[in-house]
Amino acid sequence: MDERYTQYIENLRRVRALARPEAHAGMKAADLLEEIKQNAAESYTLMQQSNAILDEVIFSRRAENLTEEEAAGLSEFAGKLFNYANSEDCGIAYKIHALLLDYARLKQDDRAIIRELYWAGVTMHYMNVRSDDSSINPLGKQVRGYFQEGASYMARYEGFDLETKSYIIRCLGNSRMAMSRHSHADCEAYMEVFDKAMGVIRSPYYRKLDPSIPWDQFEYAMHADRMTLLAYLRDFKDPEIAEKVLESAEYIHREQAKNQMDDERLQNWRLGYFYAMARYHAGRCPVREVVDVLLEAIEKADPKDYSPTGINNNLTSLSSLFYYEAALPPEETPQYACRLEKMFSKSVSYLNDLPVNQYPRVASNAVRELVEMQAGAERPYRKNMLVYMLAAHKPTYVHSLMVANLTRFFVRRLLWKKPEAMVGTMGYDTVEAVRQHAEELCVMAYECGVYHDVGKSMMTMYVGNNSRRLLDEEFVCVQWHAAFGYELLCKIGHKGDLALAALYHHTYYDGQGGYPKDQPPCPKNMKPIVDALTVADSLDAATDNIGRCYTAAKPLEKLIEELRAQKGSRYAPAVVELFDDPDFCTEFRRKLYESRQSVYLEVYRETI
């Protein structure tokens, strides 16, 4: 393999290792901060090197100029970056397969087109970030497009070799990927695609024509995927869909012994408790039975198993436990309290100890499910969400605490110097009212800062990617963290305050830019706090000179100039004008740098 490809993979692994400084008990504060700084500096250097490699070997290449040898080398490289057992870099694997698809189209090579349609669809699917029911699904349409085009070759199925036929069948089955499971109508649409694929997979004609194709495994995988409709059933009682899910669960329960293979797609690690869940939603057993099965599975999990199956057994299983435990009748809850607390502590320790390896996608999905299930449970799990953010990605937690401190600092100064700018916040409609409730407003400002980026816990594989610049497709996904945060915080009862801060913190003051797009204006009851948070967010992100490694920190003076240049458009005039006071600037500078050191030490020492 080209040595540049090997170097890129080595850089990936080194940057992941640098993300976790070698801290230890008794380590001096200055030494720990220096360790974090040095790691960030090395990561930045490696990122620049990796970007240069990618520019040379992928981004500068065009399909019309590729040779067969180069195409073969790129295909091998893509296989090293992504397969079902690991996920070194799904995004670059996708870019390679997209390039190879263009190459195959130019050559009019149908076999290669079908193969690359499959792999482009799969790698983009694993790049995508989705809510549990796929109601948020930014790349879903593109994913389905690849598979639907691949499935369209069924019309010429008999004319292809066995390998290509297998890809066509996989594309047909995968056409249901990325479909929403948010409503009964969504589930019916999913079932229509499911039934069409199963009609081919079960067909005596095709099985007789090509007996060596693993039809039974394909059927098993289809049933395993239909279990994803449990996400819909956790929100809605729907006997019709519940019976369909139970049908698949019973099939899997019967056939599981035949399908114990090293294939992450089959999710064998959780099919045991899927059966209990399906029976519960179909009214065949009490929720207590599901909780018992989950607890038994988690207690058996090896806390030192850091393989994909180990990650899922230790973390993803717990996410389901959060939901079903919350559905227990009140009189049954106390008997589980001690075991649940032990499981929670075990999962946090597991995340802290999880070595940086080639499974960032698996770990990211596990954290996503943990956070999402906690938010969906009818219990106040808000603090737990922060624990998972801390354990999963410490820089995000550092940033959140910094933004919380700075937002409160801005709001406190506005209440003192420009209280009229805070009128309307939290329903306090006069200057006198906002002054009387100043402490309450400051507490809310701090809380909004703490939780503004909670949506990033749904996409830690991107947030923690310091090995190269984000692809356009990945940036589209990252932009959805605001909407994810909004959904999560709405689910735990903060639709009117914290959720609004999460949703609007990247929206411009005048509503003419930023993201998410096409949102109504931020409600007046939270707008002044969101305005302060937006400035705090920009200032912390751009001035971090300790752990920030994807670009160099900017001088505060330059940033203040940028704030002033965008006053009234991106940033609120009332907040920007605070910097017109030299004394405020001096105090802010001290607050910024003292707080940053304190917060870094607090977060990184928690896991020593």
Regions found by a protein language model. Give the residues of each.
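Intrinsically disordered, glycine/charged-rich C-terminal tails and inter-domain linkers
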Residues: 7-39, 335-376, 585-608
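Helix-turn-helix repeat elements of alpha-solenoid scaffolds
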Residues: 36-56, 83-102, 132-155, 182-207, ...
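Acidic/His-rich, divalent-metal-binding segments that scaffold phosphate/diphosphate chemistry
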Residues: 346-479
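An active-site-proximal "capping" alpha-helix that borders the catalytic cofactor pocket
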Residues: 402-411, 477-490, 554-571
